[in-house]
Amino acid sequence: AVVPFGGGTSVVDGVDVTDRLTVGVAFWEMNSVLDLDTETGEVRVQPGIGGPELERWLEARGFTWGHIPQSWERATVGGYVATRSAGQTSTGFGRADATVTKLRIAAPVADFDLGRAPGTAAGPDLKQVFLGSEGSFGIITEIALRVRPLPEKKVYEGLLFPSFVAGKRAFRQLALDRVPADMMRLSDAEESAVNLAMSGLSGITKQAFDRYTALRKVAGGCLAIVGWEGPADVVAARRAHAYAVFRQFGAVRLPATVGRSWEKNRFAAPYLRDDLLDAGYLVETLETANEWSQLDATYDAVHDGLRGALGDPLVGTHLSHIYPTGASLYFTVITPLADDPVAQWKAAKAAAT
C-alpha cells in the first residue's frame, strides 16, 4: 500500500503498518504556492503546504482561503482536501472540498489533470472521486483553490440560549432562510459550562454575568458562537436578521469578551488532551451528521450509548457545520481510564454507533 502523509493529524490510523508492504509518502518538500490568479480568485498550491503558511502568504497579498478546521495549526492543504475537511466557517463558505477548482493526481493507472472550467455539464465530475478518498485511489500532487479578498469586517460573538433545542431551532431557521452566519456553533449545557469557565469572566464581571443571565432566564443555558465575514454593510444586514431570529428563540447576547476568548483559544482543546491523559482520563471524540428531524434522537442515542458503556462520563456536545437540511454533532468524551483504554474506547464507540 502507498499512504500519503501530510501533517499527521488524522485519527483514522492511515499509516499503521499492516501485514503487507506499506510505503508512506511524506509531502514535507512539496509545500509551495505555485500561482495566484487575482482576477479569477484562485490559488494553485502543492499538497504539503500547511494551512497557516498558506493563509499568511495569501493575506500578504490581500486574499484569504479562510478554511480553518481544528487541525489548522498542523495539518496540510492536501490533507484537508483528501478528507473533505470542514472548517469553522464551513456554513458560510463551504468545506475544503467545496473550494477545490482543479486537481492533479498521480494514480496507479494514470495521471489525472481534473477541472479546466468553472463548471461543466460533460458527465460525472471526476474530482469527486478523489476528494474525500484519503489517498485510496491516488496521490494529490497539485491543488487549485477558490480564494476571496480579505473581509472588510469580521465579527465573532457569543449568545446564550435557554436550551439546546431552542438554539438548534434558531440555527435551523437561519439555514432555511438561506442567510446563516458564516460560523455557527451551539454547545449543549455540559460543554457550555466548560467553555464559559474558560472565557475569561471572573470577579465582579463574573458576578454581574451570573445575575444578568439569571434575570434573563438563561442561566445554565447553551452557549452559541456565531461569526460573520464580508463587506461591513452586508455583515450588518445579515447580523440584524440573525439576531431577530435568535430573539424569537429566547437568546441573550453575551459580553464581547466571550466571542474574543473563543477566537483566541479555539485551538487549545487538543493540547489539554495530553494533560488529561497524564492525569488518568480518557479523552476522545465522535462526530456524525443527520437531518434536522433526526438530530434530537441522534443526540440522545449517542449519549445513552456512551453512558451505557462508560458509566458516568462527561460528554460535551456541540452542533456545527450547518446545512439546509441538517447539521453535524460533535461529541467530546472524558472519563477515567480503564486498565485497557483501547478496549474501553472501542466498546464505547461501538455502543455509540
What are the residue ranges of the model-derived segments?
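Short glycine-enriched loops at secondary-structure junctions
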Residues: 7-8, 28-30, 137, 259, ...
